[in-house]
Curated annotation (Swiss-Prot):
Binding locations of GTP: 18-25, 86-90, 140-143
Cell inner membrane recorded as keyword: no
CDD domains: RF3 (cd04169), RF3_II (cd03689), RF3_III (cd16259)
Tagged with keyword Nucleotide-binding: yes
Main location: cytoplasm
Domain of life: Bacteria
Name the UniProt record assigns to this protein: Peptide chain release factor 3
Family affiliation: Belongs to the TRAFAC class translation factor GTPase superfamily. Classic translation factor GTPase family. PrfC subfamily.
Amino acid sequence: MSEVVAETARRRTFAIISHPDAGKTTLTEKLLLFGGAIQMAGSVKSRKAVRHATSDWMTLEKERGISVTSSVMQFPYEGKIINLLDTPGHADFGEDTYRVLTAVDSALMVIDVAKGVEERTIKLMEVCRLRDTPIMTFINKLDREGKNPIELLDEVERVLGIQCAPVTWPIGMGKRLRGVVNLLTNEVHLYEPGRNFTRQDSTIFTSLEAPGLAERIGEQMLADLHEELELIQGASACFDPTEYLGGRQTPVFFGSGVNNFGVQPLLDFFVEHAPSPQQRDTTSRVVLPTEEKLTGFVFKIQANMDPQHRDRVAFMRVCSGRFTAGMKAFHVRSSKDLKLANALTFMASDRESVAEAFPGDVIGIHNHGRVSIGDTFTEGEVLSFTGIPSFAPELFRRACLGDPLKLKQLQKGLTQLSEEGATQFFRPLMSNDLILGAVGMLQFDVVAYRLKNEYGVDAAFEPVSITTARWVYCDNSKTLEEFREKNVTNLAVDASGELVYLAPTRVNLQLAQERAPEIHFFATREHAYAVGVD
């Protein structure tokens, strides 16, 4: 067996998705803790505490207590290599989350036991369904009162359209929480506040009939549990690996992330059943992970991960072959070889130089403006991975500068921050305005904050009369030039130099489309070609 085949089989690359405040970042911490990647989980609860969540590493995130950029973390567990991509839970950062989901092989969905399925979870599930991504579910905050577990499973099935297969089942909830029972092994894990719940620090009974269990949880609770399990095992599906890998069934676990409870069974099950790196579609062929030659694509760019070095790092998912430090790779878009020196692996903002990487791994490439989101790297073959789009923004603001002498820094800041993909930067053809587009208001706050802290620029963002944007293309260059002349007041270029129509109203956009039927208007732009024709 080749090294690439063996190492690919060891990889598990996944993302955690949830509605804001479902406890995703806390669970991320605990997975790292159980994986031995960190010694002490960050105090996510007290945001004023010195210890901040390991995966919320940017200054703004630490101050606000929300994840606004995706972190990448790698750790070994039970002979496997786990690549965990933490995603922003805040709704305004959906595009970043969408692109992260193109880089993983499976996902873990976190649901708040009291709130059930929430709006953001529904949207993220829709994205996962587009790619039939296998999903496991962790129902969190079991130490608080919440919905009836049977009703929760019914809600997940009804709202998200995916079959539930419970793997662990709660014994009580809130103040009555006594533990969980594993439906596959019949083991009972007791809940004892203050414990770490590692294998060495858990009270585990081998079955519901084990001596001493009734004394620990109470005769009545044990009798109720037997009754409930009879009902649930008769009414719910058994775990089916084929259905799970096809994205049609979700194994469900219950626990309390903040108390470390229920995390170990989840991680053990994940390592055993989650898929290793899968094949990937390109514009020309399917790439298998076990191919010997390196391929990979960039799904994220992060500016100023280290403010002292003013750096930009491109996050590349390795899709096939083996990456070695200092190797040259073919950058398909520019048709040039780039030396991938000083590539990095991550533990949130802690970074280490990487000697080698295999399919499923995410490496950081130092980027001096040559690499964009969606770019493909190979060992010479011309191909382009598909499905990594930019979306048309829904909100637009004009950047206003307090100090006109800082214009150059402002332009540089807006360009670099837009490369990360959470905002988009437009320059109208007929004015000197600097227009920023986003999908949520929070992004303008984030950009203003980062401009000040990372670029030394005080900028405000004022409303501008733009309702929506569309990328415009035409195969006939003469027709495109005529369209450009007639509509120059509504046209701009984005950070990549692509032509964009900025419509003041929906009616204006409709009229423009009717008057120029040979011009294609796109609501999303995918690297190498556009998708999503209006």
